[in-house]
UniProtKB/Swiss-Prot annotation:
Its biological purpose: ATPase subunit of a proteasome-like degradation complex; this subunit has chaperone activity. The binding of ATP and its subsequent hydrolysis by HslU are essential for unfolding of protein substrates subsequently hydrolyzed by HslV. HslU recognizes the N-terminal part of its protein substrates and unfolds these before they are guided to HslV for hydrolysis.
NCBIfam families referenced in this protein's UniProt entry, alphabetically: hslU (TIGR00390), PRK05201.1 (NF003544)
Record text on subunit structure and interactions: A double ring-shaped homohexamer of HslV is capped on each side by a ring-shaped HslU homohexamer. The assembly of the HslU/HslV complex is dependent on binding of ATP.
Native source organism of the sequence: Francisella philomiragia subsp. philomiragia (strain ATCC 25017 / CCUG 19701 / FSC 153 / O#319-036)
Gene: hslU
GO cellular component, one term: HslUV protease complex
Protein name: ATP-dependent protease ATPase subunit HslU
Biological process per Gene Ontology, one example term: protein unfolding
Amino acid sequence: MTQVMTPKTIVHELERHIIGQNDAKKAVAIALRNRWRRMQLDDEMRQEVTPKNILMIGPTGVGKTEIARRLAKLADAPFIKVEATKFTEVGYVGKDVESIIRDLVETAVKMKREEAKQKVTEKAAILAEDRILDVLIPPARASESKVGFANEPAEDAQSKKEKENKTREIFRKKIQNGELNDKEIEIEVSVAPKSIGVMGPPGMEDMTNQLQDLFSSLSSDKKKTKKMRIKDAIKLVKDEEAAKLINEEDIKARALESVEQNGIVFLDEIDKVCKKSGTSGADVSREGVQRDLLPLVEGSTVSTKYGMIKTDHILFIASGAFHVAKPSDLIPELQGRLPIRVELKSLEIEDFVRILKEPDCSILKQYIALMKTEGVELSFEEDAIRKIAEISFQVNEEVENIGARRLHTVMERLLEEISFDAPDLENKSINITTDYINEKLSGLVKNKNLSQYIL
């Protein structure tokens, strides 16, 4: 998708879901477009051009994670979001940073497998229908004499075959139209391998995964006759037939290439592994993790169960609130490998108003759609929308600034009664006004002690 998307187009797509933060949008748009530019270069130059990694700096709830999430859908590339705080220095109990790349490869393999299945879905559907039809209408066999010759003339056998084919086509149409969905049949299907838990030493997750795969593969060829509805059988058999049609080795090779050339890693909470200024002493979860991240970000080779992965051209986007620590508290080597700095701004009342109204699936649109399932027509006056934004901003200022996430808290509290009573309401048309908001929320906002716990 990024091959035909210019930076402006990428920013426009992001603006459909994220309000403001244009600097961050531009930075990721350029980084994404540079992927395509690099692929247009000759081989020698292509190897030299490495991605410019990004550091996003901004308070919680301003859109850092959302930009990454939307970018993943847009990029059509292997993408993984991880929290830096989940990892420990090599040698200590916990996950080591190389598991990031292993998880990224797993994501890529799943993506490529789904792509391959989509390509063979029509053929798999026909083969699945054939297997169902074989159960419904078993193929007729020519009656044989004791010496092994067919008793009936060739013309009769031919007409019987044609009649059988016509019957099969009639039933095939019925299956396709869903007329036989609830009919139960007995069909032989592959048995899903049992999941076997393997306890492994810390830092040896890759070996543990390989052992699990080995045990699973030992029972992968087993078959079992099951009784199920045709609707369920079609889905199960279609997946089986699709798996037979795709080339697993080709999928693995393409997944490895996709990770090396197009992989994106989003490292959240990077500020939590900074060593705070003026402190001293050993800290397992901090500086050691940064030093372990260095080789990945700079470019190294990581062993995975699918093969070796070079991380030279994987794009790393790090983000953090940096409330306590500062970007300069990162070790100098890691700072140098995150050359693009983007600062995301705190949200104002106007931003909250836009977040409530403008995105394709804005918060207000979500609540209106949810209530519609109960037959309730929910609407909001313009003044009421601004009031919600003002209350959210005020609580952020007075209690704790959690950014746009505060809107969800306020909306849940505001619509709690309506949501609870929705199935039994006689008046199915509800208009939210400033008076209604004042009635439900003003007391809580004024009482700081209450708002700390409720909003």
